[in-house]
């Protein structure tokens, strides 16, 4: 968080036109991410524990790319600033994992657990829901609900496997 903010401040100090999009819980059908990991784990395991006390909003990379494209294509990049983007709605990692498992057609028993059961050097916020009001007002965009976007991603993963 601190290094990201320092980077944003450096860009702002330069004095150029800029658009910064903050996001969270990013996933797609490419690379390593929570969705792909959970699909694999819930296919391979009978039981799994996932934290329920960290709340946020997943972000489908395709939706983020679409918003950025529309802003640039619509010649709106002069509206410089820092904007938040994630899909609509909120969930815990546990809720997200359960939905991934169900949409993938897996039957793993997913149990909720506390974050402190998974010690980490990186401190994770318990509530990381982004306020997208500024983005919506500036660019007049509608943002898809996280479950709808997850369905699209899972379907693309199924098609490519």
Model-derived segments and their meaning:
Residues 146-161:
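Amphipathic terminal alpha-helices
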Residues 63, 69, 77-81, 158:
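Catalytic phosphate/metal-binding cores of nucleic-acid and nucleotide-processing enzymes, i.e., regions
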Residues 29-30, 54-65, 85-103, 152:
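Substrate-binding strand-loop-helix patch
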Residues 74-122:
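Mid/C-terminal beta-alpha module of Rossmann-like enzyme folds, strongest
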Residues 3:
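Active-site helix of classical SDR
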Residues 117-136:
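A hydrophobic C-terminal alpha-helical subdomain
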Residues 9-56, 62-63, 69-70:
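NAD(P)-dependent short-chain dehydrogenase/reductase
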């Amino acid at each position: 968080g601190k290094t990201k903010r320092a980077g944003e401040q450096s860009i702002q100090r330069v004095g150029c036109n800029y658009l910064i999009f903050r996001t969270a819980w990013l996933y797609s059908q490419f690379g390593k991410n929570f969705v792909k990991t959970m699909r694999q784990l819930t296919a391979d395991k009978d039981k799994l524990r996932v934290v329920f006390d960290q709340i946020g909003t997943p972000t489908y990379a395709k939706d983020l790319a679409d918003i950025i494209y529309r802003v640039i294509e619509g010649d709106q990049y002069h509206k410089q600033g820092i904007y938040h983007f994630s899909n609509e709605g909120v969930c815990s990692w546990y809720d997200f994992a359960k939905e991934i498992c169900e949409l993938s057609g897996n039957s793993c028993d997913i149990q909720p657990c506390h974050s402190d059961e998974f010690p980490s050097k990186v401190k994770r916020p318990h509530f990381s829901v982004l306020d997208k009001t500024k983005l919506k007002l500036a660019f007049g965009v509608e943002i898809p609900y996280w479950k709808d976007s997850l369905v699209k991603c899972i379907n693309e993963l199924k098609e490519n496997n």
